[in-house]
Amino acid sequence: MQIVVGCMPALTLKTDCLMLGVWQDRTDTPLLKELDTALHGALGQSVDSKAFVGKEGETLLFQTGAGLPAARVLLIGLGAYAQADCGAMRRGAAEGARVLQQQRVKRAGLALSEAPAGLPLTQAVQVLVEGLLLASYRFDRFLTQKREDLPPLLETLDILIADQGSLEGVAAAVERARHIGHGVALARDLVNQPGNVKSPEFLAERARQLAGECGLSCTVLEQEQLEREGFGALLAVAQGSARPPRLIVLEYRGGAPDEKPLALVGKGVVFDSGGISLKPGEKMDEMKMDMAGAAAVFGAMSAAAGLRLPVNLVAIVPAVENLPSASAYRPGDIITSLSGRTIEVLNTDAEGRLILADALTYAGRFEPRAVIDLATLTGACIIALGHEASAVFSNRDELARNLIRAGETSRERLWQLPLWDSYDKQIKSEIADMKNTGGRPAGTITAAAFLQRFVPDCPWAHIDIAGTAWEAKGTALCPRGGTGVGVRLLIDLLEQE
């Protein structure tokens, strides 16, 4: 999508459709009064009849005839004016994008009926553009024939502002939205790739491409080196698949040369059948999404590089496939991790924590200032929080607070769960240093307790995105498939710094 920022009166734009963001019960602004005159009172009639009052997600479309240069005008409700809500604005823009697609609009304009209260214009524009970009995502690369039922996507968007002095800031906000939207789309694309295409090497090759595109450095450890280094937990999970594992490392250096990096670790199980502890067949097709943590890390690295954030980052992705076979690891096995600690395997479907154990240990070699891991780790997280929030655990309250704040801003919300020492007894083994599952009670917490044993001596947070990484039905902001969760969260966190 091409996005152009300009300073001109909104109602003078010649376009297929002019979108106007309208705040709830604020339908009497000068711009809307001018529009009502051009529409011969049609807007006023709609307001009087309560057909449109500017509530979040409301839309109202007018055919303008000869009254305006724009062929159509679309009003989109943005919710409360006095307490402008970024989530409501993002969803309002997404609903607008849905109407544009239904109308087969290829070029549109976007303006606000008035500047928001308590929110910078630049932030408002960024959020609206994010909503349009997220709503315009489509995964159609495997369609071999043109689908007439799929409407065209918006090709050109004109952002209209009234104040010439805001032009530079708004243009920068649009660029921020573009880089973030691209990062989310990258993450969604990776999650949506089918398992027959998405091997560990596929992820490694995509990381190499990303490094070339974004000016990152990339290192890929292949099986022989993983064996030589002693990645016993990662290799155990991978041994059931004919497709060998990879450990992928991406580095971004935007901060001072002597600044310690923030390590981002993303679970990269490209397909998870459960291994010998086989999952039920129903919805197993969705387990191509078990690398959504890796996808989020890739997307965040892309966005951070595009935004030229002044930080140093290292991304670590253990990439494996978990399948049953004659060579697969078994319940009852005892494996030795990269840390040297031994793990009794009780369930081969608790594989994510095993590969993360080695990845977290490896992260310590970079002497990070903090580590954040993201993983579709436990079904128990969905039972606890549903699909509205991800679970967060941390060994530092300040890091947890910063992440929760970023979750509110990005609307990729987090809920902190406890990590008390008393949970450790559930993963205590009598024949090894620990076991890989603590049973059904507090399953999300005991998985985090397991990971904590492998964390370097630094601030750490674990984010369980099992309930938020996949959209089962489709919404205005996201079609069915991968959500790209984590990208906006991480960028908001980094921008806080």
From Swiss-Prot:
Binds 2 manganese ions per subunit. Pfam families: Peptidase_M17, Peptidase_M17_N. Its cofactor is Mn(2+). Keywords: Aminopeptidase, Cytoplasm, Hydrolase, Manganese, Metal-binding, Protease. It comes from the Bacteria. Mn(2+) 1 binds at residues 272, 349, 351. Mn(2+) 2 binds at residues 267, 272, 290, 351. It catalyses: Release of an N-terminal amino acid, Xaa-|-Yaa-, in which Xaa is preferably Leu, but may be other amino acids including Pro although not Arg or Lys, and Yaa may be Pro. Amino acid amides and methyl esters are also readily hydrolyzed, but rates on arylamides are exceedingly low; Release of an N-terminal amino acid, preferentially leucine, but not glutamic or aspartic acids. It is found in: Cytoplasm. GO terms for molecular function: manganese ion binding; metalloaminopeptidase activity. Its EC number is 3.4.11.1, 3.4.11.10. One of its GO terms (cellular component) is cytoplasm. GO terms for biological process: proteolysis. The active site is at 279, 353. Presumably involved in the processing and regular turnover of intracellular proteins. Catalyzes the removal of unsubstituted N-terminal amino acids from various peptides. PANTHER family: CYTOSOL AMINOPEPTIDASE, LEUCINE AMINOPEPTIDASE-RELATED. Belongs to the peptidase M17 family. This is Probable cytosol aminopeptidase. It comes from Syntrophotalea carbinolica (strain DSM 2380 / NBRC 103641 / GraBd1) (Pelobacter carbinolicus).
